[in-house]
Regions:
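Short pre-catalytic segments that frame enzyme active sites
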Residues: 85, 90, 97-110, 221, ...
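Soluble, non-transmembrane domains of envelope/secretory-pathway proteins that act on or interact
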Residues: 52, 278, 420, 536-542, ...
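A penicillin-recognizing enzyme superfamily signal
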Residues: 320-343, 351-355, 364-367, 372-381, ...
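Acidic/histidine-enriched alpha-helical segments
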Residues: 140-146, 185, 220, 259-261, ...
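Juxtamembrane regions of bacterial inner-membrane/periplasmic proteins
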Residues: 2-4, 9, 14-343, 356-362, ...
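Glycine-rich, acidic and aromatic/proline-enriched surface loops and short helix-turn segments
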Residues: 170, 174, 208-215, 232, ...
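Residue-level preference for non-acidic, small/hydrophobic
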Residues: 96, 125, 168, 202, ...
Length: 840
């Protein structure tokens, strides 16, 4: 009979979970449900079973834990990093040759590990130290048993049986005392080393840290110290010597028993020949090579570049773009000129040579060799801010051409100038009155460029210089003012060479890029290799430059190559060795800095000469001190070309031949090739139509002559002040004829007089001499007809008359005054001024 179970299910038996250990079923944990454990006895039985089970698995747990700890200890047993000794800093040339190195902090020459080792050294090292290097995993059992046998048979330790890996471990652990215990540790660590490093890496670690005698550590340092060459150039004799030397490094010193070292080397060479690694002839020749004598000094071709890399990059080894052979030649030039400059107590100089295409440095002379610590030999002048002198003028000239403020031949004023108290002077003193802009650049005249900067605006110039790559303009434009063009700002040789190279790069690429501009062409120089990439799509380049156009740059460089070269007496073009170079010099105020920078389509060369402490010296000028170095350096460079004319950015324009401006209606006309921007430049302001009598002796006007009696002639008329100085250098200049006596006196803009001093409303500081007397002030005026008489008045009081030479020395009392000048024809000129007394 079927009976219904109220629970619905039969109760399941309570069975513990079990695991099988060593073929035994061991309960681990029963189903722990509070409803199934109903008594204290059951709880006790459960706890007891757990204790018994733990006792049974304890040995296994200990074994597993110990093994895990051992594996972890083995995995982490090598020190991190493996070697922590200080490393020498090294700079290499483009080909990997050593340029300069700095000794490590612990006084050792210890170079960074090399990427690859020469085969002569690898073969020699493995044959001498560890023939089974490539077959073992850190321990060579055969070598160990051989060492035990030899040591027992000799009764002393003659072989350690150490592999190269074990020696690397020993060096990494500080070369601890050798004993059996240390050997065991080294063996264990050597196996771990083999697991973590490739065979090549282990060889590199050994070669970089092995002792080679004295304070020389590592193969590369030893190769340079003992043989004066890169490890890649080692002979078999040299490689074998360096393989055996770490075994007895003290034998390298002169005076020691060097025959032992020679014998070791030759035995190794014989072994190499016996194994067929070298042929017998090579072996005999190698054994005939003598041991090195006194250590060679390490190359010190670019110590300042090494210092700069250390500060800027922090790299232990850096391959630069410098070419060691060319660097050595330029260093010789620096040394030779430094010896001459020392006679004038000029102690420092710097030279940069760079490739234009990539902007990569080829030579880096940060200071004169042997200048001495007292004279700042350690200062890297290439990056040191110095007064620019007039070295920035080509940039202003190019920018002014670019913005149509001038054209290449347009005239700029060269007269005494006083702009809000700023009174620039030309280096050679004197005035031209008016001078073509390109001539002002080639002669480096100061006053015309101050006036040009006034027209361009010093704030704009400040902004453009920073865009071109000048990094030293730390002050606002107002801080520099118009002095920005004459050395009022500091710059450095690195920035300047980069800026000139960028201009050359733009002009060089313009025809190659289908008359387009790549903004990436403006960039600073680099002492590390760069990757020059041609634009993939020339059509996407800019049609217009946002900095300097090709036409403006070409015109600038054309003007710069007209500079007279030092010592050449203007005949340098006749020499077959001459080359076309656009170059500029500069001299700072007080003769503290002399600059010279030259550029061709291929190279830029920059030179600075002076004293690191800023002391000025007579004769410290760009053309005398820096330019000769510039052209000596160019003499070492390969032949150079010249820039192709950027015809697509040039245009033939009608130019006034006498003033260089666009021809006006009264000008004669020349058709000249000028930058396209010149089409927007000013029309000639100096040619005007004048009315003359029939004899062309006098000027006349409709007020006094019938039009039928007048002749109309175009005439070149300069302002009286400019004319005054222009006539002194240009006797062919024809001044305006005087006004006819029957005609009324003209005034205003037609006045034939113009004050030279004082100009505008000015304050005149008059010094008081030691005896208490006031110094006299010299007033000066320019007149178109120098022979006329001029009557001088101060505050309506007549003080005298001048004729031909219109200067007057007078000592007005302190205060405000009015100077009135009247010539014999009735022309009148007034100027207010103020006298302020100042003690000397």
């Amino acid at each position: 009979m079927y009976t219904n179970n109220s629970s619905g299910k039969e109760k399941k038996s309570k069975k513990p979970l079990i695991c099988r250990v060593m073929n035994r079923q061991i309960p681990i944990l029963p189903r722990f449900i509070s409803s199934t454990i109903v008594s204290v006895k059951e709880r006790f039985q459960l706890f007891k079973s757990l204790i018994i089970n733990y006792q049974q698995v304890k040995p296994l747990a200990i074994a597993l834990g110990t093994g895990l700890l051992f594996l972890m200890g083995y995995f982490f047993c090598l020190p991190r990093p493996l070697f922590s000794a200080p490393i020498s800093q090294v700079v290499e040339d483009r080909a990997g040759e050593l340029l300069s190195a700095r000794i490590a902090a612990d006084g050792q020459w210890r170079f960074p590990a090399m990427d690859s080792l020469p085969q002569v050294y690898i073969s020699s090292l493995i044959e001498f130290e560890d023939r089974g290097f490539y077959s073992h995993q850190g321990i060579d059992p055969i070598a160990v048993f051989r060492a035990i046998f030899l040591n027992l048979s000799q009764g002393k330790i003659v072989s350690g049986g150490s592999t190269i890996s074990m020696q690397v471990v020993r060096m990494a652990r500080g070369n601890r005392t050798r004993n059996v215990f240390q050997k065991i540790i080294e063996a264990i660590l050597a196996t771990r080393l083999e697991f973590g490093y490739s065979k090549k890496k282990i060889l590199n670690l050994y070669a970089a840290n092995a002792p080679f005698g004295g304070n020389v550590v590592g193969l590369e340092a030893a190769s340079w110290r003992y043989f004066g060459k890169s490890p890649a150039l080692l002979s078999w004799a040299e490689g074998a010597l360096l393989a055996v030397l770490p075994n007895s490094p003290s034998l390298i010193h002169p005076g020691r028993n060097r025959n032992v070292l020679l014998d070791k080397r030759n035995k190794l060479l014989n072994r190499l020949a016996a194994r067929g690694i070298i042929d017998p002839t090579t072996c005999d020749l190698a054994k005939s090579e003598p041991l090195p004598e006194a250590p060679h000094p390490l190359p010190r071709l670019a110590p300042h570049l090494l210092d700069r890399i250390s500060k800027e990059k922090g790299y232990l080894r850096l391959r630069s773009t410098v070419q060691s052979g060319f660097q050595a030649n330029v260093l010789d030039v620096a040394r030779r000129h430094h010896e001459l400059l020392e006679f004038s107590q000029i102690h420092n100089l710097a030279i940069v040579v760079a490739d234009v295409q990539r902007g990569e440095v080829m030579a880096y002379i940060g200071n004169a060799p042997l200048a001495g610590a007292d004279n700042g030999e350690q200062v890297d002048i290439i990056t040191a801010p110095r007064s620019s002198g007039s070295i920035l003028k080509p940039f202003l000239y190019g920018l002014a051409l670019n913005d149509a403020i001038v054209s290449p031949n347009s005239l700029l004023p060269d007269v005494p100038m006083n702009i809000n108290g700023y009174r620039p002077e030309n280096f050679q003193e004197g005035y031209d009155g008016l001078v073509p802009a390109n001539e002002a650049l080639s002669r480096s005249l100061n006053i015309p460029f101050v006036d040009l900067l006034r027209q361009y605006d010093f704030g704009r110039f400040h902004y453009q210089l920073k865009k071109l790559g000048m990094t030293t303009l730390s002050q606002a434009p107002s801080h520099y003012g118009l002095s920005l063009i004459l050395g009022g700002a500091e710059t450095n040789l690195w920035d300047l060479c980069g800026m000139y190279a960028s201009m050359a790069r733009v002009l060089r690429h313009y025809p190659a890029y289908s008359s387009r501009y790549d903004p990436a062409d403006f960039h600073p120089l680099s002492y590390t290799p760069t990757q020059f990439l041609e634009p993939t799509n020339i059509n996407r380049l800019d049609q217009h430059s946002n900095q300097l156009s090709a036409g403006a740059i070409w015109s600038t460089f054309e003007a710069m190559q007209e500079v007279q070269r030092p010592g050449s007496e203007n005949q340098w073009q006749q020499f077959s060795t001459s080359r076309r170079v656009a170059w500029k010099t500069g001299t700072s105020f007080g003769f503290r800095d002399a600059w010279a920078i030259g550029v061709t389509p291929e190279y830029v060369v920059g030179v600075w000469v002076g004293n690191a402490d800023g002391e000025g010296r007579p004769g410290l000028v760009g053309t005398l001190a820096a330019a000769p170095i510039l052209f000596d350096v160019f003499g070492f460079l390969p032949s150079t070309s010249w820039f192709a004319c950027p015809f697509d950015d040039m245009v033939r324009a009608e130019i006034c031949p006498e003033t260089g401006f666009r021809a006006g209606q009264y000008c004669s006309v020349d058709s000249l090739l000028v930058p396209k921007s010149a089409l927007n430049s000013k029309v000639c302001p100096y040619h005007q139509l004048v009315h003359l009598d029939q004899d062309e002796r006098y000027q006349v006007s409709a007020q006094c002559f019938q039009p039928s009696q007048m002749l109309n002639r175009p005439w070149l008329v300069f302002p009286p002040l400019e004319e005054f100085y222009y006539r002194q250098r240009h006797p062919e200049y024809a001044a305006l004829p005087p006004l006819h006596p029957d005609c009324q006196t003209q005034s205003g803009n037609d006045s034939p007089m113009q004050l030279i001093y004082p100009r505008q409303v000015s304050r005149i500081f008059v010094p008081i001499d030691l005896d208490g007397e006031k110094s006299k002030t010299i007033f000066q005026v320019a007149h178109r007809q120098a022979s006329v008489k001029i009557y001088w008045h101060i505050d309506q009081e007549y003080i005298g008359t001048t004729q031909t030479f219109h200067q007057f020395a007078f000592a007005p009392p302190p205060g405000k005054h009015t100077l009135t000048l009247v010539d014999e024809n009735g022309y009148r000129l007034e100027q207010r001024f103020e006298i302020i007394l100042k003690k000397r």
